[in-house]
Curated annotation (Swiss-Prot):
It comes from Bos taurus. One of its GO terms (biological process) is cell differentiation. Essential for spermiogenesis. Pfam families: Meiosis_expr. The keyword Membrane does not apply. GO terms for cellular component: nucleus. This is Meiosis expressed gene 1 protein homolog.
């Protein structure tokens, strides 16, 4: 990214589950807003994803421990409202 200090302009909460919400849930579990912030902080160009589903497979937290995720959905319906959606 050209601008390494991208800040979100607005935030909203997820209302229903989707594949995008699933991936945001995984990034936020690992301590990041979204894929943009993860790539900025970890200085990586690609995120490990499951080829079958496209969901995030593995993330490295800020303390350098790893989170590993399943191929299937992990964000239950009761967790969806906790997911934050950032607009840039």
């Amino acid at each position: 990214m050209a601008n390494s200090d991208v800040k979100p302009k607005s935030i909203s909460r997820a209302k229903k589950w989707s594949e995008e919400i699933e991936n945001l849930y995984r990034f936020q579990q690992a301590g990041y807003r979204d894929e943009i912030e993860y790539k900025q902080v970890k200085q990586v160009s690609m995120v490990d994803r499951w080829p079958e589903t496209g969901y995030v497979k593995k993330l490295q937290r800020r303390d350098n421990t790893f989170y590993y995720y399943n191929k299937q959905r992990e964000c239950d319906d009761k967790e969806v409202h906790k997911v934050k959606i950032y607009a840039y």
